[in-house]
Amino acid sequence: MAEVKVKVQPPDADPVEIENRIIELCHQFPHGITDQVIQNEMPHIEAQQRAVAINRLLSMGQLDLLRSNTGLLYRIKDSQNAGKMKGSDNQEKLVYQIIEDAGNKGIWSRDIRYKSNLPLTEINKILKNLESKKLIKAVKSVAASKKKVYMLYNLQPDRSVTGGAWYSDQDFESEFVEVLNQQCFKFLQSKAETARESKQNPVIQRNSSFASSHEVWKYICELGISKVELSMEDIETILNTLIYDGKVEMTIIAAKEGTVGSVDGHMKLYRAVNPILPPTGVVRAPCGLCPVFEDCHEGGEISPSNCIYMTEWLEF
């Protein structure tokens, strides 16, 4: 008589125990777990039981649903955000999580579509809903003025999005930058002049002509010419333009930890310099640097007689 094999069904696990175990796994792996991880940790649990437990945790707002290159990820939800997303469906939670992960640099709707794999019409609907709840906000990026990036409502946009102190309503403040450029150079020139008038030996004069970026920053702040708060990084950006113009040179010295203006035991020092050789006339004239010089000829669309650069130079 042939032996009859009887398949033994595993006993039904307590749904609460399954949910608690999934929560424990999420705490062990804060960056998220896949369904395969849950299956490996609980091999005796049927797929349907896992799905029921996961869906219940998602509906209660205890888990976040993410999408990665390897598939779906489940991550423990921040308790502060759990109340914000109460009553939202899984698709809305997924979009919110993608925007949250983007931080203060924001994310375009096209990238949200790619990461969520949702239709664009559905994404636009979700974005409007989240904006109406003041959970997210749309910010125009200086990198692409016609495109908006989305970020959490309470975040301050990154400098790469707003352009920092040099932009106002997505417009580059060229006059403001020029004023800062002039004032920074004026301060360094004054420092160099004071060093020359001291009648010390050349080495002491040279060392005395240097100023740290913190000194320049403090001088600009005391002038009160800026309506926005400038950082030392902003001032160093201006000083770098002076270096590129050949008006200023920079040196880096070692500094004690905690010294004002030092970073990682180093300090940047700047001083005004004079050009070694005066520029020749052809370089100073617009023709010497004109980008359309080869196309310029009398009777043509570009000609010396209607050159706007030459007119401006002569008036100057």
Swiss-Prot record:
The modification N-acetylalanine is found at A2. PANTHER family: RNA POLYMERASE III DNA DIRECTED , 39KD SUBUNIT-RELATED. It comes from the Eukaryota. The keyword Amino-acid biosynthesis does not apply. The keyword Iron applies. Keywords: Acetylation, Antiviral defense, DNA-directed RNA polymerase, Immunity, Innate immunity, Iron, Iron-sulfur, Isopeptide bond, Metal-binding, Nucleus, Transcription, Ubl conjugation. There is a cross-link at K5, K7 (Glycyl lysine isopeptide (Lys-Gly) (interchain with G-Cter in SUMO2)). The gene is Polr3f. It is found in: Nucleus. This is DNA-directed RNA polymerase III subunit RPC6.
